[in-house]
């Protein structure tokens, strides 16, 4: 139990999928202008990342490995992710049309979010059990969610301040993301 808790802390805070592994930067930078849209993207990505990691593990261990079809792993995982994204998009469009409009193109782009595919592939590479895979996927997703919402809050606050013209927009966003990454590096002592 202690190992699973340490894995969750290490994954969510220390080895954060965005700030440490640099996965999922497209949606991280693109949707983090407002807290509301960042929270919507965080929820959608959390669902897709967690579910795709678990379903990917099942496909790997129940179909691909027994049949010697490991070379189809990438294709199978992409199909799982695309299916889950379609389900998520249908749900969001029906439940919250405003959020669906806010997320725009970024919702279907979860299909190509390298964080989702990367975490699913990492769990297979590290030969984790199903429970470890679930914890790994969920903690990575929650770490992504935490960072994108914090970053959106920081960007909203920065929009209300006077900024030098040279730093407006992307330059200040990248500097802010770098400072956030340094802050999360302070959690390194938690993982042992």
Which role fits each region the language model picked out?
Residues 7, 14, 45, 50, ...:
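Hydrophobic core segments of alpha-helical transmembrane domains in multi-pass membrane transport
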Residues 22-30, 89-94, 105-107, 114-127:
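Generic transmembrane alpha-helix signature in multi-pass membrane proteins
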């Amino acid at each position: 139990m202690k190992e699973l808790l340490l894995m969750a802390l290490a994954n969510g805070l220390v080895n954060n999928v965005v700030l440490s592994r640099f996965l999922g930067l497209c949606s991280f930078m693109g949707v983090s202008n407002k807290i509301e849209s960042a929270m919507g993207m965080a929820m959608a990505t959390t669902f897709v990342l967690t579910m795709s990691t678990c379903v990917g593990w099942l496909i790997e261990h129940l179909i691909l490995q027994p049949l010697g079809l490991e070379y189809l792993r990438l294709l199978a995982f992409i199909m799982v992710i695309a299916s889950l994204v379609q389900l998520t998009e249908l749900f969001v469009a029906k439940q919250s049309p405003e959020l669906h409009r806010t997320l725009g193109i970024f919702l279907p782009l979860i299909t190509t979010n390298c964080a989702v595919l990367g975490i699913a592939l990492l769990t297979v590479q590290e030969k984790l059990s199903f429970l470890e895979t679930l914890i790994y996927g969920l903690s990575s997703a929650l770490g992504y969610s935490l960072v994108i919402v914090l970053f959106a809050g920081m960007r909203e606050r920065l929009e209300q301040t006077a900024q030098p013209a040279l730093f407006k927009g992307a330059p200040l966003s990248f500097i802010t993301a770098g400072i956030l990454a340094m802050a999360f590096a302070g959690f390194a002592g938690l993982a042992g």
